[in-house]
Regions:
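Active-site nucleotide/adenylate-binding loops and adjacent lid/helix of ATP-dependent enzymes
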Residues: 6-7, 75-78, 88-184, 223
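Conserved N-proximal alpha/beta basic substrate-recognition cap immediately N-terminal to
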Residues: 9-115
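Protein kinase-like catalytic core scaffold
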Residues: 135, 198, 241, 254-257
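A short glycine-rich, hydrophobically flanked beta-strand micro-motif that places a catalytic Asp/Glu
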Residues: 238-250
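Phosphate-binding site of ATP-dependent enzymes
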Residues: 149-236
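Short, surface-exposed coil-to-beta transition loops
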Residues: 68-69, 184-187, 240-241
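C-terminal active-site "lid" helix and adjoining low-complexity regulatory extension at the edge
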Residues: 247-298
Length: 298
């Protein structure tokens, strides 16, 4: 049995995205195999025995160790993976990506990178004044705000934060002050998938999304947003990801949260701080288009 697209997933809040993915597969005439906790053992057996083959893997269970035997076997068999694990792991290292982005001319906040606490428990002399009165402390790995300290202002906070994830590098970043446009912060969460870019207004305090329209891009001089995201895509080499860009008060488009692979796809119709449904639908369609293109090429 062969499936054009295999989706591994377990998070209940992915359900709306999965329904949209199913619809996109139906529209394209692609077969979809869903691997979930209830059929994981059976799926592993089918994959190892050769009973089932697949064209493309979309892994939404990368942070669940139980799925590792399945996804590792997919790699061993040479099936196409959207966001290959080795590239994803590299791209999600914020310290690495910070250096890559500035090398490629992308604006980022002023940043101090610290070695893991386990490697360097005693900090060197730091000039925190370069970060401004308040700054952000964040681990190099992780998402969803895990381990992030906003509005930090002291060395004591830095020392304490480093011990939470002691084996990870940490970033100290200057806080970016965005412009205000018609009463909204010029802060954007942007989705890149299969060469397409979907920008949204995003409030960093309330986490509320609104799609950024083409008219708004032109009217408010936000057209440089897309080339910045396209350049980030060329650097990180992921098939899909989200990023955060702020349009600063000094007129710069600044990447403030570089590359997120484990994208939260809760829908706005179900969660007030979810992603607009039309954006999720477009993402699903492009992921299926990617699988369809791979099917044609193979």
């Amino acid at each position: 049995m062969h499936y054009d697209l295999c989706l591994t997933w377990y998070w209940e809040y992915d359900a709306d995205f999965v329904h949209m993915l199913e619809a996109a597969c139906t529209d394209r005439g692609l077969s979809l195999w869903q691997v979930r906790p209830h059929n994981l053992v059976e799926a592993v057996n089918s994959l190892f025995s050769g009973e089932i083959t697949l064209g493309t893997l979309l892994n939404r269970a990368a942070d669940n160790p139980a799925f590792s035997p399945f996804t590792h076997r997919v790699q061993e068999l040479g099936f196409f993976c959207i966001n290959p694990p080795e590239i994803s792991h590299w791209a999600e290292d914020k310290a690495t990506m910070h250096l890559e982005l500035i090398t490629h001319g992308i604006e980022t906040p002023y940043t101090i990178i610290l070695a893991p606490f386990t490697e360097q428990p005693l900090l060197p002399v730091l000039d925190l004044g370069l970060l401004g009165e308040q700054f952000v402390i964040k681990p190099a790995y992780g998402g969803g705000g895990e381990g992030v300290v906003m509005h930090a202002s002291s060395l004591e906070q830095v020392m304490k934060a480093r011990t939470e994830f002691a084996d990870r590098k940490y970033l100290l970043q200057a806080q970016i002050q965005p412009q205000e446009i018609t009463g909204r912060k010029a802060w954007f969460r942007v989705y890149y998938v299969n060469g397409k870019i979907y920008p949204c207004w995003w409030d960093p305090q309330t986490h509320i999304f609104n799609p950024l329209s083409a008219d708004e891009e032109e009217r408010f001089d936000l057209t440089p947003l897309r080339p910045v995201v396209a350049k980030i895509a060329s650097v990180c080499r992921l098939d899909w990801f989200s990023t955060e860009i702020a349009f600063s008060k000094d007129g710069k488009f600044v990447a403030v949260d570089y590359v997120n692979d484990g994208i939260d796809l809760r829908s706005q119709s179900k969660a007030h701080d979810g992603v607009p449904d039309e954006v999720i639908r477009a993402i699903a369609a492009e992921l299926v288009a990617l699988a369809a293109r791979h099917r044609q090429a193979s």
